[in-house]
Amino acid sequence: MIETDKLTGADRLPDRVISATPASTQEEAFERALRPKLLDEYVGQEKVRGQLDIFMHAARKRREALDHVLLFGPPGLGKTTLAHIIAREMGVNLRQTSGPVLERPGDLAALLTNLEAHDVLFIDEIHRLSPVVEEILYPALEDYQIDIMIGEGPAARSVKLDLQPFTLVGATTRAGMLTNPLRDRFGIVARLEFYTPDELARIVARSALLLNAAIDPAGALEIARRARGTPRIANRLLRRVRDFAEVKSDGTITRELADAALEMLDVDSVGFDLMDRKLLEAVLHKFDGGPVGVDNLAAAIGEARDTIEDVLEPYMIQQGYLQRTPRGRMATAAAYRHFGLASPRDGGADLAEGL
C-alpha cells in the first residue's frame, strides 16, 4: 500500500523539455507507469544496487527493519523509484511525504505513530525539514521513540511514545544542507550518479516497450545521448519523439527521426536547450569566458541562483563545459568548441583548473 501526501517541489522551469523535475501531475502519473518495480528491473547505479541488494537481503534474513537510507544526487536519477523498490522488496508499506509538508511536530508524529512494523517512510527534499520537526525525528531514528508534549504552560509534560521499528528513506538534491546530526543517523548513504548513454538507451527501450512504441537501437541511443544522463528526461523525450513519429512517419523511431524530432524541440546534440545555451553564451560573450560570480551570472540571464546551481550547472560541469573555481564560473575549451569559437587563451581549461 502506498500513501502519498501532497508534495511541494522546489522552484522549477516547467516549460523545459529537458528539465529533470516533473512538469505536471499528469507527467508524474506517466512516470509511475514506467517505474521499475523490483531491483532486478532497475537499470544503472550498479554500486548502489549491489549495496542495497545485500543490505535488504540481510535485513529480511534477520527479520529486521532495513537501516535508514539517505539517497542524494541531482533530480531525476531515480531516488523516488528506489524508495518504492525498497518497500516492495522488503514486503512492507510505504508512506511518502516531503520536507516542506511537515510544518509542525504533530505532522511528523502522526505519520510515525501510524507506521506498521518495518514500514518505509519516504521523505523527499529532506533537507527542507524545519529544525523543530527534525528534533522530533532524532529519537525516532535512534530509539524508535518520540517525545510529545501534553498540555500547555507550567502543567505541560513530556510523554514518550514507542514506535514500531521502521525504515526512513530520505532523498535530497542538496546533501550539503543536511545538518550533521541528521546525516549521522543514516546507516546507508548512497549517491546517485548521472547515467551513461548505454544505460539510458536500455531505459528508453524498456519504456518504449511499455508504451507500445516501435524503436530501433539507434533511435533509443540518439534519445539517450541527449537526455543529460537523466532517466526522467529520457522518458520525457521519448514521449515527444513518439508523437513526432506517429504524425510524421509510420510510428517507428529511428535515429534519423529522433534527430529531427529533437532538433524541432530545440535539444541539441549534447542535450543542451535554449536555457543551457543562454547560460554558456553569457559566460562566453558577456564575461569573456569567465571567471564570473554566480550572482552576476544569474542577473545576466534572468534566473535565480538556485536554478543555476541545482538545475543548469550540474550537467555542464559533469560534462566538462563549465568549471567552478574560487574566482567564479569559467567556460572550458569544450564550451568554445561547442559554439564553434576559438578559445582566446591557450590551455584555457588547464588554466582554469589551477585557479
From Swiss-Prot:
Binding site for ATP: L34, R35, G76, K79, T80, T81, E142, D143, Y144, R185, Y195, R232
Large ATPase domain (RuvB-L): region residues: 4-195
Catalysed reaction equations from the record: ATP + H2O = ADP + phosphate + H(+)
EC number: 3.6.4.-
InterPro entries, A to Z: AAA+_ATPase (IPR003593), AAA_lid_4 (IPR041445), DNA_helicase_Holl-junc_RuvB (IPR004605), P-loop_NTPase (IPR027417), RuvB-like_N (IPR008824), RuvB_C (IPR008823), WH-like_DNA-bd_sf (IPR036388), WH_DNA-bd_sf (IPR036390)
Major localisation: cytoplasm
UniProt-annotated stretches for the region Small ATPAse domain (RuvB-S): 196-266
GO CC annotations, alphabetized: cytoplasm; Holliday junction resolvase complex
Molecular function GO terms recorded: ATP binding; ATP hydrolysis activity; four-way junction DNA binding; four-way junction helicase activity
Keywords linked to the UniProt accession: ATP-binding, Cytoplasm, DNA damage, DNA recombination, DNA repair, DNA-binding, Hydrolase, Nucleotide-binding
Primary enzyme class: hydrolase
Region named Head domain (RuvB-H): 269-355
Segment forming the signal sequence: none
Residues the entry annotates as binding DNA: R305, R324, R329
Places the protein is found: Cytoplasm
One of the protein's GO biological processes: DNA repair
Keyword Signal: no
Residues noted as binding Mg(2+) in the record, renumbered to the chain: T80
Function statement: The RuvA-RuvB-RuvC complex processes Holliday junction (HJ) DNA during genetic recombination and DNA repair, while the RuvA-RuvB complex plays an important role in the rescue of blocked DNA replication forks via replication fork reversal (RFR). RuvA specifically binds to HJ cruciform DNA, conferring on it an open structure. The RuvB hexamer acts as an ATP-dependent pump, pulling dsDNA into and through the RuvAB complex. RuvB forms 2 homohexamers on either side of HJ DNA bound by 1 or 2 RuvA tetramers; 4 subunits per hexamer contact DNA at a time.
Domain comment quoted from the record: Has 3 domains, the large (RuvB-L) and small ATPase (RuvB-S) domains and the C-terminal head (RuvB-H) domain. The head domain binds DNA, while the ATPase domains jointly bind ATP, ADP or are empty depending on the state of the subunit in the translocation cycle. During a single DNA translocation step the structure of each domain remains the same, but their relative positions change.
Known partners and oligomeric status: Homohexamer. Forms an RuvA(8)-RuvB(12)-Holliday junction (HJ) complex. HJ DNA is sandwiched between 2 RuvA tetramers; dsDNA enters through RuvA and exits via RuvB. An RuvB hexamer assembles on each DNA strand where it exits the tetramer. Each RuvB hexamer is contacted by two RuvA subunits (via domain III) on 2 adjacent RuvB subunits; this complex drives branch migration. In the full resolvosome a probable DNA-RuvA(4)-RuvB(12)-RuvC(2) complex forms which resolves the HJ.
Name of the protein in its database record: Holliday junction branch migration complex subunit RuvB
Organism whose genome encodes this protein: Cupriavidus metallidurans (strain ATCC 43123 / DSM 2839 / NBRC 102507 / CH34)
